[in-house]
Curated annotation (Swiss-Prot):
Protein name as it appears in the record: Protein E6
Lineage: Viruses, Monodnaviria, Shotokuvirae, Cossaviricota, Papovaviricetes
Species for this entry: Human papillomavirus type 60
Subunit description: Forms homodimers. Interacts with ubiquitin-protein ligase UBE3A/E6-AP; this interaction stimulates UBE3A ubiquitin activity. Interacts with host BAK1.
Keyword Metal-binding: yes
Stated family: Belongs to the papillomaviridae E6 protein family.
GO cellular component: a single term: host cell nucleus
Signal sequence region: none
Length: 142
């Protein structure tokens, strides 16, 4: 079954294209709570460039509250290390502009400017489950 599911679209954009459904008409359930995502949550999922999950030929996304809980759970259970931004490029051997960093709280993909802001403001970067995280412009103020 997994092999067959590997052929299904993994992004919202690919899903809409593959099944010829406008984003505004798309209805997907959350993989965790099974409630339908609101239009705003689906748009946020799309903008964050997160991957869809296929289970038994059904497609799921993740609602905003469950996404935040997932980020918290992963940070509490899969934290590996943290470092200051000044050493991140040396540590990873990847230019900051190419390094994928998601928000520690909401899993938004940080822009290059947000990564620079994290460094300037002295924020830490955290390695969680093999992926780097820090804070996006919306969560850093909370």
């Amino acid at each position: 079954m997994q092999m067959e599911e590997d052929r299904f679209p993994t992004t919202v954009a690919d899903y809409c294209s593959e099944f010829d459904i406008p984003l505004k008409d798309l209805k997907l359930k959350c993989v965790f709570c099974r409630f339908y995502l609101t239009e705003q949550q689906l748009a946020a999922f799309y903008i964050k460039n997160l991957k869809l999950v296929w289970k038994n030929r059904y497609c799921f996304a993740c609602c905003t509250p469950c996404l935040r809980l997932t980020a918290k759970f992963e940070a509490e259970n899969y934290f590996q290390c943290m470092c200051k931004g000044e050493v991140l490029e040396v540590l990873t051997r990847i230019p900051l502009s190419s390094l994928s960093v998601r928000c520690f709280d909401c899993l938004t993909l940080l822009s290059f400017a947000e990564k620079i802001d994290c460094i300037i403001s002295g924020q830490n970067f955290y390695l969680v489950r093999g992926r780097w995280r820090s804070y996006c412009r919306n969560c850093i103020e909370k």
